Amino acid sequence: IEATAYAGDRSFVNAAKRAARRSRYTPAHFNGEPMHSGAATRITFRLSREQVGARPAFVKLYKAFFNQLKVGATTQQINHTYAALTDLGITYLYEDVFLAVVKSAYAERMGDHVRAERNLDRALRYQDDFKVFTTEKFHELQQQLFWHQVKSGSFGDAMKTWAVIEPQVRENEDFERFFKTIAEIKRLQDEGRDFSATGTVYDHYRYSRILLASAFSFTDVDGELAESKLYCDQGFLGFAIEPNVRYNIRDDYQNCTLVVIGDPDTTFTVTEHW
């Protein structure tokens, strides 16, 4: 049981983990019999819905950071404001969300679309429960997420995001750019061209991506990778990772997400094959 995001005193996290340990769930059944399957549960705890917003100091630094990006401030100035904001820390959930947006923008400024995608994806996950963004801002951030996924080589994730945002962008002046990008990804599929991306195991010991192709492999591993897990529409599989080995996915598994478990800061190249 792991607390993947929290704001407030650590005692609240400890209480939430104790509550999670006492929780029970009913396993999947087939023909009236329990079946072997993987399971993952995300539980959100909160004391009340009344606490919204952020501290004045956080808001001031947040606005200063994005204003510096807008006016083209020097890297030194941006680094200084970014450091001040991260050093301030988070007290409320809303600060956690918007700090993730800041980290995404900062990573983009540094040319790290993998980290930008990861932080923005985390921020957007709060929308369903807490409605932290206006509809217009949420759509804007979803479109940013799509481009980070494309630039980081997460084409399966990009296609999933596209299925959500396509109705939003049909009237955009930028629609042709979206359409050409999707057409190129589909052409890659049709022609069966392999493609690669850089992966990093972050502080929660995992990395994940939606697979577009029917096979994958790991190369250039710097660090320690322990195991992979495949979560598919029609099956689940876990296995130890061997670098430079091609793993083929059964045709009947369909629509798979690859999860990689390893030591934090381990980097590698993942290649998807057809």
Pin down the residues of each PLM region.
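Alpha-helical protein-protein interaction scaffolds
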Residues: 62-193
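Extracytoplasmic/periplasmic, Sec-exported soluble proteins
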Residues: 4-12, 50-57, 70-73, 111, ...
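A short, well-structured alpha-helical segment
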Residues: 1-29, 244, 253-254
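Low-complexity, Pro/Ser/Thr- and charge-rich linker/hinge segments at domain boundaries
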Residues: 49-60, 190-194
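A short coil-to-beta-strand element that immediately follows conserved catalytic motifs
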Residues: 2, 35-38, 107
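Acidic/histidine-rich, surface-exposed loop or edge segments in extracytoplasmic proteins
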Residues: 2, 59-63
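Short, positively biased Gly/Pro-containing turn/loop motifs at secondary-structure boundaries
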Residues: 17-53
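Eukaryotic alpha-helical solenoid repeat scaffolds
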Residues: 167-274
